[in-house]
Amino acid sequence: LTTVELGYKALSLFAVAAYPRPSDLARLSRDRFEKLAHGVRYRYFGTKELRAVPKFTGQHGLGFEMQELVCPASALEAYIDRTADKSVFFHSDSVYPFEHVFMSQTPARYGTYKGMHHPVGAQTCSRWMKEVMTRAGITGYSGGSVRMAAASAAVDNGVPIDEVLRTGRWSSWRVFNQFYNRSKLRAVVPLVGRTSLA
């Protein structure tokens, strides 16, 4: 993959794994990430909370080659490693003077800066995610609705509701169903947390 394609991939897979907003992705700092043997750990946006994105292993039901292709932690590690050269990749800007993770290549029309990579903003992150979703055949969602698209697709594909709620960190089925659920099974009311039908 080219660096730009790897950026799209890393950003999109991380967005699906961690569900940040595009503005959080744009402000994501390199010093918040720590590589681990089993994945990556990062400080959650604006807090001191540590979260981990594990590397895919056998429990996902995918072959080894497929796991490597869709693993968010591996894609993010590869992107951070590839964009470490500060002579080509300008990690900071005047608005947020820290080392950004995601960058975009400057178009040829900018002369001396041609080919250089600069930090991206929230709109670029959103556009990248929307483009990846469109290429994957997921239409009707904005770049900021990766969490909603993933959860709705999971419901459509028969993933248990309690697993969808837990994985997506939804506060309740009612909130998810009322405001975010776009699945074909919207009218289905699960028995999450109930012990009887009464």
Show which residues each predicted segment covers.
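Basic, Lys/Arg- and aromatic-enriched nucleic-acid-binding interface segment
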Residues: 1-22, 70, 147
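N-terminal core-binding DNA-recognition domain of tyrosine site-specific recombinases/integrases
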Residues: 1-4, 120, 140-141
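Short, charged phosphate-coordinating catalytic segments
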Residues: 15-41, 86-90, 160-166
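Conserved tyrosine-mediated DNA breakage-rejoining catalytic core shared by Y-recombinases
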Residues: 27-73, 78-81
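Active-site/catalytic core of tyrosine-dependent DNA strand-transfer enzymes
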Residues: 64-138
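Short, basic (Lys/Arg/His-rich) helix/loop patches that form interaction surfaces
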Residues: 122-166, 185
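Catalytic-site neighborhood detector that most strongly recognizes the C-terminal catalytic loop/helix
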Residues: 167-193
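C-terminal secondary-structure termini that scaffold catalytic or DNA-interacting sites
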Residues: 194-198
